[in-house]
């Protein structure tokens, strides 16, 4: 093999490597994102044997969606803006398929990582979760523009486009929040919703006194107000032992 052909080989990895890269990245992505599901198997000692399978097999199976996606689009990706959109769109479509195949498994979507930014997620009410997920993936992968082989002007334009998108999401979300507050202020009959998340340990065989104490804590955490019609949502786990 001469030097020239060796350089070409290094720049063009085997397709199976794309599959492997996607599989490993997907496994780490889902392992870190849904490892919490094993907590439900610690409740009963009979289920503890399933923890290794839930911890390893579920992320591994889900990572196949990402592996096949990277396997298909990997050979066509380059250091340009078009490839960024192809990559982001393909991952978003992969998430969409994952939410539909075999009754659907729409967990750990990229968009969920922004649920703490109330202003940003408002747009999902208008364009839908999957479209918003596409925007989030594009923003997360946008730092790749620093490796583009384009001139500085095109890189600057791409960076400004990203900043503009972020500002637009924030401004729109802030507008929607304020608009909803005004609408709620003009509504006389309201029903409030309060989600309660106590830190009870799940136990069976509780005594009557323990059950009573648990109810008292739930009521205290709920902090009901007689002047407000409120729907309280308690997690099903709080009724363990009843």
Question: Where are these predicted regions, by residue range?
Answer:
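Membrane-embedded alpha-helical bundles of multi-pass enzymes
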Residues: 1-182
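Soluble catalytic regions of membrane-associated enzymes that act on cell-envelope
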Residues: 173-242
């Amino acid at each position: 093999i001469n030097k020239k052909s060796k350089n070409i080989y290094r720049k063009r990895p085997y397709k199976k490597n794309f599959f492997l890269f996607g599989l490993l990245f997907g496994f780490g992505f889902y392992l870190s994102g849904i490892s919490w599901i094993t907590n439900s198997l610690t409740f009963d000692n009979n289920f503890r044997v399933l923890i290794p399978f839930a911890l390893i097999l579920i992320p591994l199976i889900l990572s196949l969606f990402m592996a096949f996606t990277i396997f298909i689009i990997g050979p066509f990706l380059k250091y340009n803006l078009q490839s960024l959109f192809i990559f982001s769109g393909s991952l978003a479509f992969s998430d969409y398929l994952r939410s539909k195949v075999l009754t659907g498994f729409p967990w750990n979507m990229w968009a969920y990582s922004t649920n703490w930014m109330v202003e940003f997620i408002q747009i999902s009410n208008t364009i839908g979760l999957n479209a918003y997920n596409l925007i989030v993936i594009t923003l997360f992968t946008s730092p790749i523009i620093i490796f583009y082989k384009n001139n500085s002007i095109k890189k600057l334009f791409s960076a400004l486009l990203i900043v503009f998108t972020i500002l637009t999401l924030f401004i729109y979300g802030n507008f929607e929040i304020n608009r909803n507050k005004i609408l709620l202020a003009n509504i006389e009959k309201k029903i409030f919703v309060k989600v309660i998340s106590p830190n009870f340990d799940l136990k069976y065989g509780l005594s009557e006194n323990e059950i009573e104490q648990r109810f008292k804590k739930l009521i205290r955490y709920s902090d009901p107000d007689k002047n407000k019609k409120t729907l309280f949502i308690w997690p099903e786990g709080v009724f363990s032992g009843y």
